[in-house]
Amino acid sequence: MDKERTSYRPHMHSHNKYELFHNNRFYDTRYITPQSEGVDPVALENELRTAISGEVRFDAGSKATYSTDSGNYRQIPIGVVIPRTERDIEEVIAICRRFKAPVLSRGGGTSLAGQTCNVAVVMDLSKYYNRVLVLDKEGKTVTVQPGIVLDHMKAYTEHYGLTFGPDPSTHNHCTIGGMLGNNSCGVHSIMSANYGYGAKMEHNLTTMTVLTYDGIKMTVGPTSDAEFARIVAGGGRKADIYTKLKKLVDKYADLIRQRFPDIPRRVSGYNLPDLLPERGFNVAAALVGSESTCVTILSATLKLMPTPRARTLVVLGYPDLYDSGKHVMEILAFKPIGLEGIDDLLIQNMQRKGYHTEHLTLLPGGNAWLLVEFGGDSKTETDALARAMMARLKARKDPPEMNLFDDPAQEELLWKIRESGLGATAWVPGDPITEEGWEDSAVPPEKLGDYLVALRKLFSKYGWHIPLYGHFGQGCVHCRIPFDLQTPEGLDEYRRFTEEAAHLVVSFGGSISGEHGDGQSKADLLEIMYGP
């Protein structure tokens, strides 16, 4: 075959101008970015196959499978690699570096903002690289490979009476690596905030072992002045990285303190505050939320906490969503381990889709509800906490409707209602298709009620009347919006709305993303939040 026919560019000899034919396979050339331009996929595939024990998939079907996550984007990868070992990962990075091919780590593909799809070599760590490495029961830590699914890790640790705070609703298939990439939180992150280390993944991490694109393997974490001096004195690439990070934070420390909102759910942007001296120059925490743009995670040591032996759930019914939001702070004073909000529109969607319809009768009267969960060592303790909160609320002039649940089976059914929020807001019969793009904004919890009023007003301006729900105890609001992403006019409207919504949440001292990360959908809004 002549050189013209095997080069990676459109040419007259292929089936059409967008295809390259080589070894009885067509390569689609439409998906080339400045980062991937010039990469020879044929030679890259051959070298990867020779070098690693894992799977190398450059076929059209595999690339189509990995071209999307759970969000709005479809971008065909250069190819897919599924490593079996740490050595495989090191070889993949080294080979891709020689070919100048971008690399993207991927876990369960549950990201909602386009983080795990791109024109890159996608490295799926979930199939093989998913083991528990070390459990330290006394120290309450666990070291894992990044491809392990959260529920699988928790099933292991809970055998020893230990659990992990952050738990996204996709806990049965999201991976620890993806959670670290997103700085994930979840329903019971408030448990970790009240009784553990903090709400987000960055708070529940001790150290990480990472690999840079230029092949440097290092273990990172909090860095004392003495440790920093030892690293710098040792020279080499790690010393160079640490020195540059130190210069960065020294230069912009005051601006970082000023511009990064100090709220429970600030996920947008890099975690530069974790490099501040008062945070212990924590390089591991600073890398959390970097969405595979800085390093590849090889392993992570996470902080565990005792599993609550007993739980009690109270559901509160309010006349409207705004009222429920305005009373969050009063409930937080009782230190629940979960505090979630849902509205009547979400319940209507569930009824239309047939989601948990037999369980909806468990809800007390109202048009909006708060699910408040208490944890402790005994049912007596958790029931007492719940009843103390209920007594306080009953003393109000306008108390909510209240149901206390002692049956664990009923409690599980009610949590399934909340966890169905994402599915209940998508593909509702008779309604326009809804999309991600502005689905996880967050504000200080004390401002949640007023923010919900303002957000509804903004939705009404665009003619949208959509369900709202979320992690109200931490000021995070979830929704899906009927964006028109198919026409130029619709895309213009999408852009106008997201910019207006970004200005709105920033005016409340909030964050563009409170859980799902910036990804591709929100990255260009960061200037509104942090300035140029």
Regions found by a protein language model. Name each.
Residues 131-135, 141-328:
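FAD-binding subdomain of flavoenzyme oxidoreductases
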Residues 2-98, 108-140, 169, 293, ...:
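N-terminal flexible segment immediately upstream of the FAD-binding catalytic core
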Residues 521-532:
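Acidic/histidine-rich catalytic neighborhood
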Residues 175, 182-183, 494, 515, ...:
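Glycine-rich anion/phosphate-binding loop at the beta-strand->alpha-helix junction
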Residues 89-103, 157-174, 178, 267-287, ...:
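Short, hydrophobic/aliphatic alpha-helical segments
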Residues 57-66, 274-280, 284-496, 502-504, ...:
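C-terminal substrate-recognition/cap domain of FAD-linked oxidoreductases
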